[in-house]
Regions:
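Haloarchaeal acidic low-complexity proteome signature biased toward cell-envelope/secretome components but also
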Residues: 1-3, 14, 18-19, 172-195
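Beta1-alpha1 glycine-rich phosphate/pyrophosphate-binding loop at the start
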Residues: 2-55
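Short hydrophobic core segments
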Residues: 5-7, 95-107
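A structural signal for the hydrophobic beta-strands that form the central parallel beta-sheet
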Residues: 71-73, 103, 140-141
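A conserved short coil-to-beta-strand element within the FAD-binding core of flavoproteins
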Residues: 73-86
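A conserved FAD-binding loop/helix module that cradles the flavin
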Residues: 141-185
Length: 195
């Protein structure tokens, strides 16, 4: 059983994988390579002046691979159902079990519907601020939760929010993924008020 199963290999799914795998959770991404990023060129992603969408996705894949993410490339998830201890994902190749599932399938909301997630009046998946759906342990991100406001940077943020909530649940306390250089105290001083 994997800890986190992510359905979708675009900005939201790979962002989730980056945070969860980097922080030690066993993570599997099911990626059919159907991301809209292959039709995009990014000029509006903070910190990146300009990048082809396909290059951006390849860079993200390399990054999540470096943290040990298991990527099931080309495998489509046909169904997700809740179990007593998480979720079962079904594919043509077999079944996979996970403690958490993150749905990052763009505007395709079929898996969320079959899982029993609540929808809003606008027919998008209803989530809280952590991207968790009405089904405990199931998260939805990106275009699944918005009618029109689809941007790579928003989707990546959704994936990060889902990942941080999963990490907080697993660690039993609020979790933040800050990478601090070893010499931060020397460079920046003591930024923590002990009072």
């Amino acid at each position: 059983m994997t800890t986190v199963a992510i359905v979708g290999g675009g900005p939201a799914g790979l962002s989730t994988a980056l945070f969860t795998a980097k922080n030690g959770l066993e993570t599997t991404v099911f990626d059919t390579d159907g991301t809209w990023m292959h039709k995009a060129h990014l000029f509006n992603y903070p910190g990146i002046g300009s990048v082809d969408g396909s290059v951006f996705i390849e860079n993200l894949r390399d990054q999540v691979n470096s943290y040990g993410t298991e990527r099931e490339q080309g495998i489509e998830v046909s169904d997700v159902e809740g179990t007593d201890d998480g979720f079962t994902l079904r594919t043509d190749e077999g079944s996979y079990d996970a403690e958490y599932v993150v749905l990052a399938t763009g505007a395709n909301r079929d898996l969320a519907e079959s899982l029993g997630c609540a929808f809003t009046d606008e027919d998008v998946v209803e989530v809280d601020v952590t991207m968790e759906t009405s089904v405990a342990g199931a998260y939805a991100t990106g275009a699944m939760v918005r009618t029109e406001e689809w941007q790579a940077v928003i989707s990546a943020g959704d994936g990060a929010a889902a990942a941080l909530n999963i990490l907080s649940n697993e660690k039993g306390e609020h979790f933040h993924d800050f990478d601090v250089p070893d010499d931060a105290d020397r460079v920046f001083g003591d930024l923590v008020d002990d009072d």
